[in-house]
Every structure is written in C-alpha cells, then in structure tokens.
Amino acid sequence: MKTLYLPLFFKMKSWIICVLFISFSPILMSQIYEIGFSVGGTNYVGDIGSTRYIQPNQLAGNVFFKYNYNPRIAFKGTYSYLPIKGDDATADTPFRINRNTPAISFSNTIHELALGMEFNFYEYNTSSRTKNWTPYLLIELAAFNYDAIEKEEDLNRNGQIDADEYQYDRKTRIAIPIGVGFKSILSGPIAFALETKIRYTFEDDLDKVAGNNRDLKIEGNSNDWYVFTGVSLIYTFGRPSCYARRN
C-alpha cells in the first residue's frame, strides 16, 4: 500500500511547490532596489536671516535606500547631514537688518533620519527605453537631532550667545519633510535626480533663540523650517521586476 501512495505523494508535493512558486514569484521578481547619495545645500527659515525658502548657503548631503514597489510608488529611507546657519546681516527685510547691533547670527548642525513614500507622476521603469524619466512627489516623516539652548537667560541682550556662560544640549524632535524632484536614467543601472525638500518642524529654537525671548526684537512666532536642495546619483540593483517591460 505504501508503494501505491508514494507516486501520489510526490505528485501532490510537486503540485504544492508549483503553486507556491507561482504565488510568490511576483513578490520575488519585484525586488528592485536603489541606493544613492545626494550633494547640495541647505538653508533655514525662521526668526533670523533670510525669509526665502530656497536659498542654499551650507554644503550638505545624504545617503538613501529605496524599494520600488511598482512603477508609480517607491518606499525610501534617508540619513541626512544638514548644517544650517542664519545671519541678519544678509536678511532680506529692513526690520531684521536693523533690529539689533551687532546683527544676530547662529549656526547649527542637524542629523536626520527619514522614512517615506515617493510618488512618480509618470510610470518609471529602469528597464524601459521610454518610461525612464519622471517628476515625483516625496512625503516623509523624519526624526532630527540638533543643538538647542537650554536656558534663554544664556543669551545676552543683543541676542548673541555668551560662550562662557551658556548651556546647550542635543534635542531630537519630529519634522514633516515634503519634496519635489525630477529623476532620469543616465546609463544602464545609473540614474540621477534633482530634488528640493522642505521640512516643517514643531520647534522654534533651531536658531538657538526662542521666539518668546523678551530681550530680543523677534519678528513673528512661527516654527522653524529647514530646506535641502541638491542632485543625487542613484544605482539600481536586484532582480528585474515583474512590471519591467522593455518598451
């Protein structure tokens, strides 16, 4: 009897393996990944300096990893190194230029980890001859770490930091990055992208000056923003996806 059941067992086993392979093959075949880095500039928008949202003045960069879920959607993780600075001497409003003497200035360094989704306006296919470029929208959630003054009393009446007296500490907070960009294949698995990403924070002390400091003539009380604008070099690897049609 055992001899009679053996052929049936092997047939069922082969059938089960075949069904599992067919079921999971789209997942296995869709493993298209991207790694890359960006180089560009940052700028800050807050209580000090220029109020322009895109005006890079500090060299910055990031590294990232992406998983292309389909031709329109990708999941992205990014680490960014983002120095920022502001100086009322280069402000674009008379109020900020003239409010204090000497002019208020600051510098800070932000370390950021972000996770989000990239939405392509057109189908983007690294194996296609025609669908190899697209503008895109990026929405993320980020955790960022920066220097913050612990006590407002550490600032003197002109808004400058008394280096021998002030106390500061690193803070980690949440930001909401939103970006737009354009990407295109260069050659084979190599692509490039141009991107601007602006972050809204829920903090008002990236400039190490709190908006409610009574000794300073602060204009407005909105939270701070920081922006990165740059160019990316991207390498695509992994198995060709199930949607990769060469057309």
Language-model segments: what does each one mean?
Residues 28-68, 230, 234-240:
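Short glycine/proline- and aromatic-enriched beta-strand/turn motifs that initiate or cap beta-hairpins
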Residues 31, 55-59, 109-113, 133, ...:
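Residues that define the transmembrane beta-barrel architecture of outer-membrane proteins
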Residues 37-39, 63-67, 77, 115-119, ...:
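Residues on the lipid-exposed face of transmembrane beta-strands in outer-membrane beta-barrel proteins
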Residues 45-51, 99-106, 161-168, 216-221:
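Extracellular loop and loop/strand-boundary signature of outer-membrane beta-barrel proteins
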Residues 187-247:
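Predominantly the C-terminal beta-signal and adjacent terminal strand-loop region
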